[in-house]
Regions:
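Gly/Ser/Thr-rich phosphate-binding loop
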Residues: 1, 55-104
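AMP-binding/adenylate-forming core of the ANL superfamily
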Residues: 114-142, 148, 201
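Conserved acidic residues
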Residues: 41-42, 63, 139
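AMP-binding/adenylate-forming catalytic core of the ANL superfamily
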Residues: 138-206
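Structural motif
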Residues: 42-44, 66, 199
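Alpha-helix/helix-capping structural signal
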Residues: 48, 70-71, 154
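AMP-binding/adenylate-forming
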Residues: 1-52
Length: 206
């Protein structure tokens, strides 16, 4: 089922998967609390949508559920959710290149994907089936072997809020141009993974 906007990579990849696999794609209105038919084989959605369904008492009855785009709150990251996986990927990889089942901290490569790390212990991705060779990320990991890793966090200051990446430096520079001192950081959020928090101080007399 397609429950994400098709104009963004997460939703568009569902269209691609259905086309390549000659699968029947059920179209659902993309919203925070999606209406998903029962008995489907595969659904992809954001952690925020998954949490909204759980809190509304509407557990999904599908074979496989793929979550991606942002972090998942720890209280929902449980092995009790059978058939639910968190995907690891980015726009540059077009789709997920690794998966981990809920309740496990270990991501495992998809297909011919292989992993290594650079001198900053950041993940490097090689995926021949996607035409990717040594794509360097800003994600720090503990590499277990060429196919598995444990995600440990970002090297940079990017804030991932519900799948939207925010760069604090850009917001801070705009404020600086208006004589406002600003510092932006991230605060953990159960539904969106992170939310931005900004402290402002004017440099002019009030």
């Amino acid at each position: 089922a397609l429950v994400l906007p098709a104009k963004y990579i997460g939703g568009f990849m569902m269209v691609v998967r259905a086309f390549i696999g000659q699968l029947t794609l059920h179209l659902c209105e993309p919203r925070a609390l999606p209406e998903v038919p029962e008995g489907l084989d595969f659904v992809s959605m954001t952690p925020a949508q998954f949490i909204a369904l759980q809190e509304a008492g509407k557990p999904l009855k599908v074979k496989t559920l793929l979550l991606g785009g942002s972090a998942l709150a720890s209280r929902f990251d449980s092995a009790s959710y059978q058939g639910v996986y968190l995907g690891y990927g980015m726009t540059e990889t077009a789709s997920h290149v690794a998966l981990r089942p809920l309740g496990s901290p270990i991501y495992t490569a998809v297909g011919s994907t292989g992993f290594s790390v650079n001198t900053d212990e950041c993940l490097c991705i090689s995926a021949p089936h996607l035409g990717i060779a040594q794509l360097q990320t800003q994600d720090r990991v503990r590499l277990l072997d060429k196919k598995r890793f444990h995600y440990e966090g970002r090297l940079d200051h990017v804030i991932n809020s519900g799948g939207i990446k925010l760069h604090p430096e850009k917001f801070e520079s705009v404020c600086d141009a208006h004589s406002i001192q600003a510092v932006m950081s991230a605060k953990g959020h159960e539904r969106y993974g992170q939310v931005p928090v900004m402290v402002l101080r004017t440099m002019d007399d009030v």
